[in-house]
Amino acid sequence: MGETKIIYHLDGQETPYLVKLPLPAERVTLADFKGVLQRPSYKFFFKSMDDDFGVVKEEISDDNAKLPCFNGRVVSWLVSAEGSHPDPAPFCADNPSELPPPMERTGGIGDSRPPSFHPHAGGGSQENLDNDTETDSLVSAQRERPRRRDGPEHATRLNGTAKGERRREPGGYDSSSTLMSSELETTSFFDSDEDDSTSRFSSSTEQSSASRLMRRHKRRRRKQKVSRIERSSSFSSITDSTMSLNIITVTLNMEKYNFLGISIVGQSNERGDGGIYIGSIMKGGAVAADGRIEPGDMLLQVNEINFENMSNDDAVRVLREIVHKPGPITLTVAKCWDPSPRGCFTLPRSEPIRPIDPAAWVSHTAAMTGTFPAYGMSPSLSTITSTSSSITSSIPDTERLDDFHLSIHSDMAAIVKAMASPESGLEVRDRMWLKITIPNAFIGSDVVDWLYHNVEGFTDRREARKYASNLLKAGFIRHTVNKITFSEQCYYIFGDLCGNMANLSLHDHDGSSGASDQDTLAPLPHPGAAPWPMAFPYQYPPPPHPYNPHPGFPELGYSYGGGSASSQHSEGSRSSGSNRSGSDRRKEKDPKAGDSKSGGSGSESDHTTRSSLRGPRERAPSERSGPAASEHSHRSHHSLASSLRSHHTHPSYGPPGVPPLYGPPMLMMPPPPAAMGPPGAPPGRDLASVPPELTASRQSFRMAMGNPSEFFVDVM
């Protein structure tokens, strides 16, 4: 008996399919071909020879018509009939890239009928179909189901459930690669008197193992859902029956892609390992090109290796071995109930997550604000006074990403600042790499895409990649293991933030509070270094006032050690004032020091060019009454703005045109001598001389400013 090969093209797919019929070519009819394919809703076109046009595609609809044969084989094209819906599965066969590849079985998982039941499923046909590609078996199963539904002999009932009533039985796993575990639960699909590890479909061992896999995985997922219900009452009305477990099988062609492109996350608890999950998907890999696997999906099986009873370490080792082998890779994953990974894998970036000392912050708040409001502060901007404050709350709305006009000529720091903002669109979150958590990391390909779409001037994506490489070389972004070459598949974190914190303002620049609006949050210099230049219309030191009726007397700011409560350097070792005992000794040894003050010479080392937050009328008589009242006055007028400029004291001169206010001569004392240090360097004072209510808060504030990413706020 002869054999006929039939090559057929399915719709617009590039790769043809091959079936063999145990009939000679001159006896093969359309009915024989349809009997093998079982596709009644398709139109059949065959390669034939026309006398006028030559080789054409001829449509044949008569089942008894002989099929045209060329060189001992038949070439056919199958086209879906217009308006026909052969299968209710939610995909279209016109687009082969969207077809979920199933397991390579034509009978369907869980089909209760043995393979011998199907007509035209002889030994040769079944063998060749099994060796066919997955898409062939997919469409075969797709067309097989409506035909079964038509005949009355297929309306049998299984455990009291009609076959027609539950078309998304495990047979549906073959056509749409999905299986709803809740439907398995609500139907008596498995024999209750059999062992848990077996099913009634003993004739199909591969399919029953998949059924066991899905049932065990559903049991594990149910335990996790119960724990969530205990933590949150909002899930109390949701039961396991409403949380459908969607399992898909994806076959990836590794010939087109260089890498798989996934990172896996292992979950463990006191009861053991809790499974392998997809942590993130890298762009450019095989998984990203397929598009069906998402972060949060649970990895159940790779090729023929089941991860069910395997530890996380063994699963990682097996996955690495499979990836390095040539050939396609088949992944069986359970879709997560919420496909968005933000809710379950990440922490909010807008709130701090690292612990600090709340008592120190409370005392700092009380000491810095006192009983008076902070002068020059805008009510629309939050101050750094509580544990819930964040760096992002100090950024005015005018500095959001939409207002950044970024181009390739912009400063790199400005571009990185816009990239680091929470509204930038760059996905920055905790990543898992080799079981090491990398906090606030992002993928190199995301950086390139962000630059290409948000920075003007790039002609193509290659230039954006070069710019990202320059960001790495400049230190604005860093590799997790400090590699200097940029790769789109690697994780990166932002560089040192201290340089960018100088751009964050704590005030509205509306001119309502004079020069105090120029205060900015910036890193403080070393105690031995001179302070940076101030942003003022006149340079340091300030010129003497033209009207000075008492040149021999210093101003009130040094009366009886008033600087003891003034702002200090954040290091706690420098102060803008001096203690009383040292001032008294200097008064006896250097009575002419006050004259040098009025001359405007470089000896004014303890003066700054800051405009005073306290006007002349605010200089209460309590300042001249004694040390205690003086310290209280300084603390009460000490605002957050002056604390951030902690290396400066209160100014020497009042507003322009207004003479300084002087007290009685017997209450005056000269300032420290000029030989204490270079111009601009504040004199030294030990931290022990700081009032006790300020010591703890300053230590905490110093630690927070010195380690902004560790203590202050989760910026990135």
UniProtKB/Swiss-Prot annotation:
Underlying gene:
DVL3
This chain's protein is named Segment polarity protein dishevelled homolog DVL-3
Q: Name one GO molecular function term.
A: protease binding
Please list the residue ranges that the record marks as compositionally biased, kind Pro residues: 653-682
What are the entry keywords? Cytoplasm, Developmental protein, Dwarfism, Methylation, Phosphoprotein, Ubl conjugation, Wnt signaling pathway
Upon changing residue 271 to K, the result is: Localizes to plasma membranes
Annotated ranges, domain DIX: 1-82
Extract the PROSITE patterns matched here: DEP, DIX, PDZ
To which species is this protein native? Homo sapiens (Human)
What domain of life does the UniProt record list for this protein's source? Eukaryota
* Listed PANTHER family: SEGMENT POLARITY PROTEIN DISHEVELLED, SEGMENT POLARITY PROTEIN DISHEVELLED HOMOLOG DVL-3
Q: Where in the cell is it found?
A: Cytoplasm
* Positions carrying Omega-N-methylarginine: 27, 212, 342, 698
